[in-house]
Swiss-Prot record:
InterPro entries: PSI_PsaA/B (IPR001280), PSI_PsaA/B_CS (IPR020586), PSI_PsaA/B_sf (IPR036408), PSI_PsaB (IPR006244). GO terms for cellular component: photosystem I; plasma membrane-derived thylakoid membrane. PSI electron transfer chain: 5 divinyl chlorophyll a, 1 divinyl chlorophyll a', 2 phylloquinones and 3 4Fe-4S clusters. PSI core antenna: 90 divinyl chlorophyll a, 22 carotenoids, 3 phospholipids and 1 galactolipid. P700 is a divinyl chlorophyll a/divinyl chlorophyll a' dimer, A0 is one or more divinyl chlorophyll a, A1 is one or both phylloquinones and FX is a shared 4Fe-4S iron-sulfur center. The gene is psaB. It catalyses: reduced [plastocyanin] + hnu + oxidized [2Fe-2S]-[ferredoxin] = oxidized [plastocyanin] + reduced [2Fe-2S]-[ferredoxin]. It is an enzyme of class 1 (oxidoreductase). The chain crosses the membrane at residues 46-69, 135-158, 175-199, 273-291, 336-359, 375-401, 423-445, 525-543, 583-604, 651-673, 715-735. Phylloquinone binds at W679. This is Photosystem I P700 chlorophyll a apoprotein A2. It is found in: Cellular thylakoid membrane. [4Fe-4S] cluster binds at C567, C576. It comes from Prochlorococcus marinus (strain MIT 9515).
Length: 742
């Protein structure tokens, strides 16, 4: 008999119903639950999947490079980066009539093309690429890299090349390798590229394979390095009049501390970026020599964690926190879910910071003036951050169900957190209620008084504390005279005593959207608290799901039921919606809600500044109808008109996606609201009809059709809700911004 899917779970493969297909898909990547899985095999399989992941990334990068080199307009963009709209790729579509063909033939192309809003053109331009040939070469290199990493993944599954479990659990060596080699060396290597290729290109000096060994990146060569005269590398920076990409106004410095933006490219100074990378690379290389290596040199992580407790004779909290970090070393070492949770949380925070800083401190030349790209990149990175953060809590909960050992962690910080979960959860609950009632109350009050013609009766609160923080960083307009905004303060005196010119105060006090700190008022105050509500509610649901994963008063044996379980069986009334999986599922809706508010805020505030109409956000952002009418409705107008009875324009694809996104989103509710019985009856009706329909009934199947379980239907519903939500808002952001600014 042929092997039935899933091959990795023979118990499931014997299931006579369609359930085996869905459970097979659900557990395909849950290696821990597969037949014959050992801890060593689990680590080896995961290690190999990392190489597969790298191959996919390399292939994706190669595809972007190849299509832009083949069908894009990179060389034209290089000649005039502020006016040439970058092309992502050509479109060949049999559905296109003459109207849409004409509308999509744009940016100087011969036929229909898509415009690129990825920022790739700006990045490649900034790092010194200038020709299509260079893009093709990079594409070939990335394709070879993809093949190489795929081979590495396959190789490490072969018996001779499988690393041992002890190798995977050698924490100190892994940390040293990741810190010094992966982070440290790659940062230094990137500095090398910036200094040897990107900075010369930004000054009109071409460096290629033909001359890179003969063009000195700095007139003094390595002499200042070996004579410890490192300051020489910071002397003679580019002038404020430098024309990016040319020798006009160019200097010779390679590592600077100028601060602010290059006046023409409106991006961070490349020499500042190079300085950042060499500094951080050096720090990481030092950090990579911190932990105990094979020769016994360095610190033991176990000793560090166990010394970090309240039994130290000089500790003022002696004994009051239990035994703090004892047992944590073994717990983290032996739990992949704990490690993954930590990694996802760290990467989630970093990704959200990337979103913020790509707008506040743009690092790529001329990208700050490509408003659609800036909006798309902000939105993209915030949504990615949301998924990573929810994933962090999900794996934290799985850790508590599958990997947590109460004996090993007795009275340490993990046990203490579990022991005080009621206080943690109730405080978070209280915070969300305070935030929710007050914020909504003020918004609704303002709506009512505006609706009745008394806008002057709105409750408008100046964000004085946030304004003070901005003033401390040097924002002059509020008149606070604090730290950097007070020329006589110790901070200002210290800043002014640094040798050379510095431009961060100019950046902070700019009058346009590129100011590092945009002016804030009552509308910002309100939306800040709405976002705080979203953050705290999402956190509440996720933290409760993780802390309650092992058991609650209602279900004391929850840990035995696993991470996801339905309302399961007799005598279990009222146990629906109580698995940790349910918490993750519910938190996703709040997280999507939250990221919508975050991106609405960023996008509308920037649209208003870019259009020279700051008052629109400041005045309409203080009541809900202002948001609905002057942001959502007003900016949907062009979108809805992408195609109409009178013809189409280049926004039509986004108009269609906006419509389709709403459809996908709404489909989610069909799965979310109706429960199992409905689907079972529907399926049985369809099967009955199929079996009685001539010709159709020639097709049969062996599996008995069984409806989706509650958990499965929720997953299908959540997937549609999420994808529809993102499709809708993505189309909205791109079309509403590009419709205004081209």
């Amino acid at each position: 008999m042929a092997t039935k899917f899933p091959a990795f779970n023979q118990g499931l493969a014997q299931d006579p119903t369609t359930r085996r297909i869905w459970y097979g898909i659900a557990t395909a990547h849950d290696f821990e639950s597969h037949d014959g899985m050992t801890e060593e095999k689990l680590y080896q399989k995961l290690f190999s999947t990392h190489f597969g992941h790298l191959a996919i990334i390399a292939l994706w990068v190669a595809g972007n490079l190849f299509h832009i080199a083949w069908q894009g307009n990179f060389e034209q963009f290089v000649l005039d980066p502020t006016h040439v709209r970058p092309i992502a790729h050509a479109i060949w579509d049999p559905h296109f009539g003459s109207g849409i063909t004409e509308a999509m033939t744009q940016a100087g192309a011969d036929g229909p093309v898509n415009i690129a809003y990825s920022g790739l053109y700006h990045w490649w331009y900034t790092i010194g690429m200038r020709t299509n040939e260079q893009l093709f070469q990079a594409s070939i290199f990335m394709s070879i890299l993809a093949c190489w990493t795929l081979f590495a993944g396959w190789l490490h599954l072969q018996p001779k090349f499988r690393p041992s479990l002890a190798w995977f659990k050698n924490n100190e060596s892994r940390l040293n390798h990741h810190l010094a080699v992966l982070f440290g060396f790659s940062s230094i290597a990137w500095t090398g590229h910036l200094v040897h290729v990107a900075i010369p290109e930004s000054r009109g000096i071409h460096v290629g394979w033909d001359n890179w060994l003969t063009v000195l990146p700095h007139p003094a060569g390595l002499t200042p390095f070996f004579t410890l005269n490192w300051g020489a590398y910071a002397q003679n920076p580019d002038s404020l009049e430098q024309v990016f990409g040319t020798a006009e106004g160019a200097g010779t410095a390679i590592f600077t501390f100028l601060g602010g933006l290059h006046p023409q490219s409106e991006a961070l100074w490349l020499t500042d970026i190079a300085h950042h990378h060499i500094a951080i690379g050096t720090v990481f290389i030092i950090a990579g020599h911190m932990y105990r290596n094979t020769f016994g040199i360095g610190h033991s992580l176990k000793e560090i964690t166990e010394a970090h407790n309240t039994r130290h004779p000089l500790d003022p909290h002696k004994g009051s926190f239990g035994i703090n970090h004892d047992g944590l070393y073994e717990t983290v070492t032996n739990s992949l879910h704990f490690q993954l949770g930590l990694a996802l949380a760290a990467l989630g925070v970093a990704t959200s910071l990337v979103a913020q800083h790509m707008g506040a401190l743009p690092s790529y030349a001329f990208i700050a003036r490509d408003y659609t790209t800036q909006s798309a990149l902000y939105t993209h990175h915030q949504y990615i951050a949301m998924f990573l953060m929810v994933g962090a809590f999900a794996h934290g909960a799985i850790f508590f169900v599958r990997d947590y050992d109460p004996e090993l962690n007795k009275d340490n910080v993990l046990a203490r957190v579990l022991g005080t979960k009621e206080a943690l959860i109730s405080h978070l609950s209280w915070v969300t209620m305070i935030l929710g009632f007050h914020t909504l109350g003020i918004y609704v009050h303002n709506d009512v008084v505006v609706a009745f013609g008394n806008p002057e009766k709105q409750i408008l609160i100046e964000p004085v504390f946030a304004q003070f923080v901005q003033a401390a960083q040097g924002k002059m307009m509020y008149g606070f005279n604090a730290l950097l905004s007070d020329p006589t303060s110790a901070a200002s005196v210290a800043a002014n005593s640094l040798p050379g010119n510095h431009y961060w105060m100019d950046l902070i006090n700019r009058q346009d959207a590129l100011s590092a700190f945009l002016p804030i008022g009552p509308a910002d105050f309100l939306v800040h608290h709405a976002i705080a509500l979203g953050l705290h509610t999402t956190a509440l649901i996720l933290i409760k799901g993780a802390l309650d994963a092992r058991g609650t008063k209602l279900i004391p044996d929850k840990k035995d039921l696993g991470y996801a379980f339905p309302c399961d069986g007799p005598g279990r009334g009222g146990t629906c919606d109580s698995s940790s999986w349910d918490a993750m599922y519910l938190a996703m809706f709040w997280a999507l809600n939250l990221i919508a508010w975050v991106t609405f805020y960023w996008h509308w505030k920037h649209l208003a500044i870019w259009q020279g109409n700051v008052a629109q956000f400041n005045e309409s952002g203080t009541y809900l109808m202002g948001w609905f009418r002057d942001y959502l409705w007003l900016n949907s107008a062009q979108l809805i008109n992408g195609y109409n009875p009178f013809g189409v324009n280049s926004l039509s694809v986004w108009a269609w996606m906006f419509l389709f996104g709403h459809l996908v989103w709404a489909t989610g509710f069909m799965f979310l609201i109706s429960w199992r019985g409905y689907w079972q009856e529907l399926i049985e009706t369809l099967v009955w009809a199929h079996q009685r329909t001539p010709i159709a009934n020639l097709v049969g199947w062996r599996d008995k059709p069984v409806a989706l379980s509650i958990v499965q239907a929720r997953l299908v519903g959540l997937a549609h809700f999420t994808i529809g939500n993102i499709l809708t808002f993505g189309a909205f952001v791109i079309a509403s911004t590009s419709g205004k600014f081209g």
